[in-house]
């Protein structure tokens, strides 16, 4: 029999407790039980006046509102406030009653501009939640996985301008210059002079009058801090690069945000400085991080770099670099035709140049497979930090390393997929790097806290079940009781 009573209870008056309306296994209840949110007061105490002004909005509520937004992947703050108005669990989490007015959607933005801008508040919140994970001994930092993903910026790809920008200095530049000059002196060469041009002369190609290299970049007029990123063969967008490190259990250990046009190997140092002291034994990364500088940095710090095979960039039909054998004793290369390529110089990029004799190569039967140079001289380069790259190759072939590298898809790549699908990290509505760092920090904080809350609840449930079993078998099954105690 069909019942029609859908509209009968709409105008009923009831008395209830807010706490009774939120299920015991609701995610927000589990999160609220997992961490004491009062730590936020200590972080923002210097942002508020102690003895004058109107009473402010509770800082904990102020942080919890965007936390709800990123936890549930709500697209905007305006939509988040609308959801809070009608969602009992959201109101309970914020400490609001049913008749309390929800803060205006612009409240958080104004507080961010006036109080939290140019501070590391959101990174401190991320670190505080990460400390809770450490407290429960859930994190194993011995194996760390590093990768980067791109987040589409709030910028129209057609609204841009081109500008001349100075090439940014590499993090290893000073050390590399020193070792280049030492290497040149060992080979009887003069140290390289600093690049300085006459200011009266016009800039040379790729350079400037002050010696700094320049390049032409595309800059968004909407969000100048984002970077022009090539997404596929036929699509370019302005984006941010989010670099992340996690352990083998999927706990996020650190992050950094950079413009989307910067290569992962250039921005690695900013992330590495945040995580290098947590006890890393092995660091796993993709081919984008396979550079001599990163290999040297990790090995000098006692960390095992696990980097994949990187195919040679040789043209089809030509000998690969691996077919030229390096003789360490005589410091030379031997070509496939058993001819010597002798040391010539060490360039500014840190590469030793080994050249063949053009007169000998002119009559070589393999010339067309070797070089296209007009003088028939073959040049093979070797970085002064190449021994570190060779060490990485030895590590890659060690037993068990292939299986460890395969865990990337189960750890850091899964995190990116979860963040984009469930937490709104596929694109951003924020403009500027600082706001993007806030979004990423809170998103990763809520991902860690969500996982922590579920594990604490699951552990508590198992503990209760274990106690019930222990009571049941205490009098009747001594052997079973002993087994349970050993678990």
What are these regions (language model features)?
Residues 91-95:
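Short arginine-rich
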Residues 24-67, 72-73, 384:
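Basic, short loop/linker segments at the boundary and entry of helix-turn-helix/winged-helix-like folds
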Residues 1-29:
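Hydrophobic alpha-helical membrane-insertion signals
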Residues 4-8, 54-56, 98:
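A short, ordered amphipathic alpha-helix with a cationic face
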Residues 11, 24, 37, 58, ...:
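Generic alpha-helical segment signature
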Residues 4, 66, 73-86, 96-487:
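Anion-binding and metal-coordination hotspots
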């Amino acid at each position: 029999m069909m019942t029609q009573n859908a509209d009968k209870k709409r105008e009923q008056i009831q008395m209830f407790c807010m706490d009774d309306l939120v299920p015991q296994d609701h995610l927000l209840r589990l999160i609220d039980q997992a961490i004491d949110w009062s730590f936020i007061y200590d972080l923002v105490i210097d942002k508020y006046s102690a003895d004058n002004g109107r009473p402010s909005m509770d800082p904990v509520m102020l942080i919890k509102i965007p936390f709800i937004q990123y936890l549930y992947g709500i697209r905007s703050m305006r939509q988040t406030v609308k959801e809070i108005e009608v969602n009992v669990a959201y109101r309970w989490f914020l400490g609001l009653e049913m008749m309390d007015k929800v803060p205006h959607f612009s409240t958080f933005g104004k507080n961010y501009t006036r109080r939290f801008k140019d501070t590391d508040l959101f990174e401190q919140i991320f670190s505080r939640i990460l400390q809770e994970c450490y407290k429960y001994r859930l994190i194993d930092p011995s194996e760390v996985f590093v990768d980067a993903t791109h987040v589409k910026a709030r910028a129209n790809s057609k609204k841009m301008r081109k500008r001349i920008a100075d090439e940014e200095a590499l993090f290893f530049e000073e050390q590399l210059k020193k070792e280049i000059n030492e290497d040149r002196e060992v080979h009887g060469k003069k140290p390289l002079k600093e690049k300085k041009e006459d200011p009266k002369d016009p800039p040379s190609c790729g350079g400037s009058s002050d010696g700094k290299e320049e390049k032409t970049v595309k800059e968004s007029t909407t969000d100048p801090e984002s970077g022009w990123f090539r997404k596929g063969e036929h699509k370019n967008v302005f984006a941010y690069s989010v670099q992340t490190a996690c352990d083998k259990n999927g706990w996020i250990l650190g992050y950094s945000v950079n413009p989307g046009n910067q290569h992962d190997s250039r921005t690695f140092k900013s992330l590495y400085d945040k995580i290098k002291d947590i006890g890393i034994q092995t660091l796993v990364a993709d081919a984008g991080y396979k550079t001599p500088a990163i290999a040297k940095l990790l090995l000098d710090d006692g960390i095992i770099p696990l980097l994949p095979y990187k195919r040679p960039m040789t043209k089809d039909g030509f000998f690969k670099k691996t077919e030229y054998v390096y003789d360490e004793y005589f410091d030379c290369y031997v070509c496939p035709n058993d001819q010597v390529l002798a040391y010539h110089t060490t360039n500014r990029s840190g590469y030793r140049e080994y050249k063949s004799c053009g007169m000998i190569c002119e009559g070589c039967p393999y010339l067309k497979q070797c070089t296209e140079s007009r003088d028939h001289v073959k040049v093979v380069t070797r970085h002064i930090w190449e021994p570190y790259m060779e060490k990485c190759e030895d590590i890659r072939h060690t037993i068990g390393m292939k299986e460890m590298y395969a865990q990337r898809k189960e750890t850091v790549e899964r995190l990116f997929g979860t963040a984009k699908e469930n937490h709104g990290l596929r694109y951003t509505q924020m403009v500027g790097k600082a706001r993007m760092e806030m979004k990423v920090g809170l998103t990763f904080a809520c991902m860690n806290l969500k996982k922590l809350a579920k594990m604490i609840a699951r552990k508590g449930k198992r503990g209760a079940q274990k106690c019930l079993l222990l009571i049941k078998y205490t009098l009747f099954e001594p052997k079973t009781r002993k087994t349970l105690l050993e678990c």
